[in-house]
């Protein structure tokens, strides 16, 4: 049985549908990221799950019981969920220990159990040596750990996280990504994590839910959404792909600027119709001197390049601009005429 189920969940504001009839099921212990650009509806979805917003339509279920419907709504305090906000929202006048223990105090947990649970969480979040300090004496990463420990103190079934790392610098974000996932695996609760950051989603999630304009575009593992995007939006948003406009000739062949390409996977529009293909930057070959170029090659010229240590990125004009990642030792001057070879089995058709 799914731990969390959203059925036809909808939220409207004047002039806009923020969340548009989405369906989603999340299993016990799963880590799911809601990923998308600003305004796509991901935070609104999270706030409806938490009970801070009431849906206009649809239902929310937890462990088979309906907690939100058009006729009845379970209040937030009875949902056995915890939420971590972008601002952390820890109490500045309380010590680390007092902050972590506050939810247990509100639940009137016995003193001995409270101390035991707080001690365990302080150890798990590596805050045991900071227990008597105040938030103003902590780094941003330590404050985030306090928010995590406090959220876990009531032993929630579901942990909701709303852009929790956006206020941290890049190095701390990297550390905290692994820390959040480590705690998830240790305590085995269900996590719903909202982010606009593709790297966060790819490194943390069991599954990624990609949202756009209030709707779910694609659901899949990090590998699935990266390797097999089902739309032009997903391919562009996840990144690492070239998206090119082509004309479908028939079968698995397309026309790119007057040159035929075989496409190994994906969906295709009707013959003669315009469509898109996507191909990863590392799945395209740059041939400075191809001789007889062979199949699935198109001519182009180098517009620009960037040396990035481990590789070089080339921008090549093939009637459209394409980005190609090649080994660092491959050096081709700007303006050079080249051939670009597309690996058919790595090219994906996008009918929409």
Language-model features, listed with the residues they occupy:
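ABC ATPase nucleotide-binding domain
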Residues: 5, 25, 61, 339-341
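Pre-Walker A (P-loop) beta-loop-beta motif of ABC nucleotide-binding domains
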Residues: 22-33
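The feature captures the beta-strand-to-loop junction immediately N-terminal to the Walker
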Residues: 35-37
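Helix-to-loop junction immediately C-terminal to a conserved catalytic motif
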Residues: 50
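Conserved ABC transporter NBD signature motif
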Residues: 58-69
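ABC ATPase nucleotide-binding domains
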Residues: 76-82, 86, 90-233
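Glycine/charge-rich catalytic "coupling/switch" loops of P-loop NTPases
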Residues: 255-305, 329-352
């Amino acid at each position: 049985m799914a731990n969390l189920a959203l059925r036809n969940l909808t939220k409207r504001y004047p002039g806009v549908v923020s969340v548009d009839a989405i369906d989603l099921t999340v299993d016990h212990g799963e880590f799911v990221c809601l990923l998308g650009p600003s305004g796509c509806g991901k935070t609104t979805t999270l706030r409806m799950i938490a009970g801070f917003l009431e849906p206009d339509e649809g239902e929310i279920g937890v462990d088979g019981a309906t907690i939100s419907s058009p006729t009845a709504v379970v209040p937030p305090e009875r949902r056995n969920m915890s939420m971590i906000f972008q601002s952390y929202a820890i109490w500045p006048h309380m010590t680390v220990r007092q902050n972590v223990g506050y939810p247990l105090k509100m639940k009137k947990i016995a003193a001995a159990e409270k101390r035991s649970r707080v001690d365990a969480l302080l150890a798990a979040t590596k805050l045991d040596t900071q227990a008597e300090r105040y938030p103003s004496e902590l780094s941003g990463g330590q404050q985030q750990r306090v928010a995590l420990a406090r959220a876990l103190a009531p032993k929630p079934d579901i942990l909701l996280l709303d852009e929790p790392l956006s206020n941290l610098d890049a190095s701390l974000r990297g550390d905290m990504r692994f820390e959040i996932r480590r705690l998830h695996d240790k305590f085995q609760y269900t996590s719903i994590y909202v982010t606009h950051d593709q790297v966060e989603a790819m490194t943390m999630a069991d599954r990624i839910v990609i949202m756009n304009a209030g709707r779910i575009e694609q659901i899949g593992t990090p590998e699935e959404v990266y390797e097999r995007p089902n739309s032009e939006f997903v391919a562009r948003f996840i990144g690492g792909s070239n998206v090119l406009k082509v004309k479908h000739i028939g079968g698995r062949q397309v026309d790119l600027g007057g040159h035929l390409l075989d496409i190994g996977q994906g969906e295709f529009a009707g013959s003669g119709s315009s469509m898109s293909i996507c191909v990863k930057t590392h799945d395209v070959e740059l041939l400075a001197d191809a001789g007889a170029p062979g199949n699935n090659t198109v001519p182009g010229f180098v517009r620009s390049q960037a040396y990035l240590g481990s590789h070089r990125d080339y921008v090549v004009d093939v009637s459209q601009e394409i980005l190609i990642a090649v080994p660092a030792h491959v050096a081709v001057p700007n303006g050079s005429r080249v051939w670009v070879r597309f690996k058919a089995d790595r090219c994906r058709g996008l009918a929409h």
